[in-house]
Amino acid sequence: MNILIIFASYLLGSLPTGFLIGKYLKNIDLRTIGSGSTGATNVLRNVGKWPALFVFIIDVGKGFIAVKIAQYYTDQELIEVIAGISAISGHIWPIWLGGKGGKAVATGLGMFLALSWKVGLASLGIFLIVLTKTKFVSLSSISAAILLPIFMFFYLGEFIHTYFFISLIVALLVIWKHRTNITRLIKGEESKINQNQ
């Protein structure tokens, strides 16, 4: 059963929501324009506000549902977090798109909302605060990722815990996926949320 949960979580994460929206509404391949990501930000810049909101909600749901399914069928924390990371992996490296997907932010948020809604909401709050102040989605995502393990530590009260380790792994993964954004931020070349890349 555990193997089935993990495999199903990857397939769930692999659902190419942004790609399908781009194809259906504008007949464009998001992998070839803008940031090349199939996530909500690239949808916002190249398709529109409401399609981007739809993609964001679905992508959050992928991480959330994967963890909740695992929690329903098992009480093992390790399986819960593996299900979540499988959904994230599917989102980043979807089997249907040759391994070229999103950057894990929305699906990661969904995962942590399922593991601890307080930690998830705290991270979302940081994202929104930084976005409001700077208009940089990438900087907002990186800031939320950096603080995620800290929020998880305060929630748990300890470092030696499965949830803390997975929060650290996801944070590093999100930061790594934004490495080109970090370079552009340093050079002053990064696009703001209302600018096309």
Curated annotation (Swiss-Prot):
<comment type="similarity">
    <text>Belongs to the PlsY family.</text>
</comment>
<keyword id="KW-0808">Transferase</keyword>
<keyword id="KW-0812">Transmembrane</keyword>
<keyword id="KW-0997">Cell inner membrane</keyword>
<keyword id="KW-0594">Phospholipid biosynthesis</keyword>
<protein>
    <recommendedName>
        <fullName>Glycerol-3-phosphate acyltransferase</fullName>
        <ecNumber>2.3.1.275</ecNumber>
    </recommendedName>
</protein>
<keyword id="KW-1003">Cell membrane</keyword>
<dbReference type="GO" id="GO:0008654">
    <property type="term" value="P:phospholipid biosynthetic process"/>
</dbReference>
<dbReference type="Pfam" id="PF02660">
    <property type="entry name" value="G3P_acyltransf"/>
</dbReference>
<comment type="function">
    <text>Catalyzes the transfer of an acyl group from acyl-phosphate (acyl-PO(4)) to glycerol-3-phosphate (G3P) to form lysophosphatidic acid (LPA). This enzyme utilizes acyl-phosphate as fatty acyl donor, but not acyl-CoA or acyl-ACP.</text>
</comment>
<dbReference type="GO" id="GO:0005886">
    <property type="term" value="C:plasma membrane"/>
</dbReference>
<feature type="transmembrane region" description="Helical">
    <location>
        <begin position="136"/>
        <end position="155"/>
    </location>
</feature>
<feature type="transmembrane region" description="Helical">
    <location>
        <begin position="78"/>
        <end position="98"/>
    </location>
</feature>
<feature type="transmembrane region" description="Helical">
    <location>
        <begin position="1"/>
        <end position="21"/>
    </location>
</feature>
<keyword id="KW-1133">Transmembrane helix</keyword>
<keyword id="KW-0444">Lipid biosynthesis</keyword>
<feature type="transmembrane region" description="Helical">
    <location>
        <begin position="159"/>
        <end position="176"/>
    </location>
</feature>
<keyword id="KW-0472">Membrane</keyword>
<keyword id="KW-0443">Lipid metabolism</keyword>
<feature type="transmembrane region" description="Helical">
    <location>
        <begin position="111"/>
        <end position="131"/>
    </location>
</feature>
<comment type="pathway">
    <text>Lipid metabolism; phospholipid metabolism.</text>
</comment>
<comment type="subunit">
    <text>Probably interacts with PlsX.</text>
</comment>
<dbReference type="InterPro" id="IPR003811">
    <property type="entry name" value="G3P_acylTferase_PlsY"/>
</dbReference>
<keyword id="KW-1208">Phospholipid metabolism</keyword>
<dbReference type="GO" id="GO:0043772">
    <property type="term" value="F:acyl-phosphate glycerol-3-phosphate acyltransferase activity"/>
</dbReference>
